[in-house]
Amino acid sequence: MGLVVEDFPKELLVDIVKRIERTADRNSVSLVCKRLYEIDREQRDFLKVGCGLHPATEALTALCLRFANIKKLEITYFGWMSNSGKQLDNQGFFVLCSNCPLLTELTLSFCSFINDNGLAYLSSFPKLRSLKLNFAQSISSNGILSLVVGCKNLSALHLIRCMRVTSVEWLSYLGEFGKLQDLSIKYCKGISEDDQMKLGPGWNNLRHFEFNTVNITIWTHGCIHLSLLPHS
């Protein structure tokens, strides 16, 4: 009599599922049987969602409830148009924050309807270590400040094309009280090279720094842990 999935030990099935990297493949495997579905539900710790999330809030809620151990989440609306359905907004973002207690890494790209009020919900994530914002046109310096004050363990912050981020009070706060090791600021017109000095003593903790017009000879001084400094 041949073996069926139910005959295999759970440890073996977990190892098999972990080795499947493509999301589409994992989705297919989870449909094979209830046991693989449950293992995938328990083991999946990364989600990438975007324009196909419709209706956005309800769909994301369902995903978060199914995959309760999500640690890394990427939401991208690149290529979004008004006829693609509604984007995730502040209300939906609040639902996200209520259902992903283990979240440590978050990427928001082209999310036009999440503003400073929505970003403030992230302060409820004590484990959040990494935030990447790409083309976040509704988020300003105030939102970034509330984020860094609330997220005490933030060690990586990437800001790309965030045009409303201008004042750098948040950078001063990170320099004094933060644990920042990875800082990337690209194409944020409101932040100049001189503004980087606001990081102050925080420079000594940096291991990776990226700024689109940085002068290397200025910023490497005193950064004893800095290992990577790309520039353009």
Functional labels for PLM-detected ranges:
Residues M1-F110, N115-S123, R129, F135, ...:
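N-terminal adaptor-interaction module of cullin-RING ubiquitin ligase components
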Residues A59, S82-N83, C151, I160-W170, ...:
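Leucine-rich repeat
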Residues T76, S109, N134-F135, H158-R161, ...:
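Per-repeat beta-strand-to-loop junction in leucine-rich repeat
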Residues K127, H231:
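ATP/adenylate-binding site constellation spanning eukaryotic-like Ser/Thr protein kinases
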Residues W203:
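Compact interaction modules built on cysteine/histidine frameworks
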Residues L206-F209:
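Extracytoplasmic/lumenal domain signature
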